[in-house]
């Protein structure tokens, strides 16, 4: 008898909305040389092939810093930098081109066979490289000639779009030519960032050695706004980190985000399946740089009723919440505040004001099981308390049978039935015997 896998079923159900949302979108993937050297790179390439098979338009940008440094060491060349930018003289340029060319051939070959030994074996992936980027020299700075180190002059985004629309993966590296036919060494973060901006990409994705950006406790920070990310960059650079995958990607992500790229994702190249988990799960696995959070706290609308019902039904069945019908919710929806993450309602609460007595009830407080160890309840309490103050209310009360200590830890004090508004006293259920707690606003 075959075994049933409920985890597979649940995972597929959760991923389907993201499969639909990502189809037809353009993603720019930045692969640093460190990621290419790692043992997990074959799995990353296979996952890139899987994304392509799902109808996602992909531009892959690869870097070659460790490969270039290894080439220089082999040929007894000492790398030179000015203001943390490599100086690429003619001899160095030849070694840069050699390293970049070998990587291009290797990545192309791997992508071409990425769907082998999968149910999609036989599906053809067309990988295209070309002179989509025109470069120009960095020039001379403080009397230092950067020689063949360059920057992007322009991108032929229309040509890139044509290749993407024809079903190809576009592969670009750190070497580009100028209008005079010279070759220049570019940084992979500049190439990936400018491509993401010019192509109006939905996402830019980068790989680093860790799972993302961590806080002081070592926990992954799931979201950063550009200003917060810039602060992280400043701290890393002050510590002497100018070239790690994390700092290079964050520099590009901040610029991309401020230029219209909705989300930039930083994930680990060491974790098998990190790319898929980041893109096809609600909470991901790494760090996102975003202009607007994937999670919103807002007033509920009539379109939120289904999500609220799905959230509160299990609690009603356990007797934790008083049952509410759909009709009642429709009539009272303007009283509700919701926390929504990627179109899933993960928390809700309602405020029922009694203005004659300057008091309000916080009711129907519910948080999705996956988020109860986080601060969503506190977010709701802060929002509902702010709404109560705006309405001129001086106190907030709750009736609870299971969350007494949670509310007391946040300043609520025990009270008697007589302290409730007159209308609420008349409706108090003595059989349920809910505890009454009051917060002075």
Curated annotation (Swiss-Prot):
Q: Which subcellular locations apply to this protein?
A: Cytoplasm
Q: What reaction is this protein's catalytic activity?
A: L-glutamate + acetyl-CoA = N-acetyl-L-glutamate + CoA + H(+)
The name under which this protein is listed is Amino-acid acetyltransferase
Q: Which HAMAP family match?
A: N_acetyl_glu_synth
Source species of the chain: Pectobacterium atrosepticum (strain SCRI 1043 / ATCC BAA-672) (Erwinia carotovora subsp. atroseptica)
EC numbers listed for it are 2.3.1.1
Record-linked Gene3D superfamilies: 3.40.630.30, Acetylglutamate kinase-like
As for family, the record states: Belongs to the acetyltransferase family. ArgA subfamily.
- Its domain of life reads Bacteria
**InterPro entries per the UniProt record, alphabetical:** AceGlu_kinase-like_sf, Acyl_CoA_acyltransferase, Asp/Glu/Uridylate_kinase, GNAT_dom, NAGS_kin, NH2A_AcTrfase
Q: Does the keyword DNA-binding apply?
A: no
Record pathway: Amino-acid biosynthesis; L-arginine biosynthesis; N(2)-acetyl-L-ornithine from L-glutamate: step 1/4
EC top class, in one word? transferase
């Amino acid at each position: 008898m075959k075994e049933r896998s409920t985890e597979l079923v649940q995972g597929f159900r959760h991923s389907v909305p993201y499969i639909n949302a990502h189809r037809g979108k353009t993603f720019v993937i930045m692969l640093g040389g460190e990621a290419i050297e790692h043992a997990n790179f074959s799995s990353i390439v296979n996952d890139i092939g899987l994304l392509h098979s799902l109808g996602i338009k992909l531009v892959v940008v690869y870097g070659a810093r460790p490969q270039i440094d290894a080439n220089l060491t082999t040929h007894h060349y000492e790398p030179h930098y000015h203001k943390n930018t490599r100086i690429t003289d003619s001899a160095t340029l030849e070694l840069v081109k050699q390293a970049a060319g070998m990587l291009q051939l290797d990545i192309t070959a791997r992508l071409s066979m990425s769907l082998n030994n999968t149910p999609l074996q036989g599906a053809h992936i067309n990988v295209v490289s070309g002179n989509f980027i025109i470069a120009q020299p960095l020039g001379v700075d403080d009397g230092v000639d950067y020689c063949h180190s360059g920057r992007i002059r322009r991108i032929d985004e229309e040509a890139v779009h044509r290749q993407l629309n024809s079903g190809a993966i576009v592969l670009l590296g750190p070497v580009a030519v100028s209008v005079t036919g010279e070759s220049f060494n570019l940084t992979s973060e500049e190439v990936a960032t400018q491509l993401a901006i010019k192509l109006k990409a939905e996402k830019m994705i980068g790989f680093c050695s860790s799972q993302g950006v961590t806080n002081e406790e070592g926990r992954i920070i799931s979201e950063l706004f550009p200003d917060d990310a810039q602060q992280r960059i400043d701290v890393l650079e002050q510590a002497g980190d100018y070239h790690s995958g994390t700092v290079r990607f964050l520099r590009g992500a901040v610029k991309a985000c401020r230029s219209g790229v909705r989300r930039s994702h930083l994930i680990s190249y060491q974790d098998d399946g990190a790319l898929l988990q980041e893109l096809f799960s609600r909470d991901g696995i790494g760090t996102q740089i975003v202009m607007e959070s994937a999670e919103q706290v807002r007033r509920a609308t009539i379109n939120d009723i289904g999500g609220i019902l799905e959230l509160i039904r299990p609690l009603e069945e356990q007797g934790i919440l008083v049952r509410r019908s759909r009709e009642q919710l429709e009539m009272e929806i303007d009283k509700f505040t919701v926390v929504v993450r990627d179109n899933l309602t993960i928390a809700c609460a309602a405020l029922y004001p009694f203005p004659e007595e300057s008091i309000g009830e916080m009711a129907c407080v519910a948080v999705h099981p996956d988020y109860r160890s986080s601060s969503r309840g506190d977010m709701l309490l802060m929002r509902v308390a702010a709404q109560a103050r705006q309405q001129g209310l001086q106190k907030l009360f709750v009736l609870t049978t299971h969350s007494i200590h949670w509310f007391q830890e946040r300043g609520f004090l025990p009270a008697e039935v007589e302290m409730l508004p007159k209308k609420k006293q008349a409706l108090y259920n003595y059989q349920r015997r809910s505890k009454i707690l009051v917060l002075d606003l």
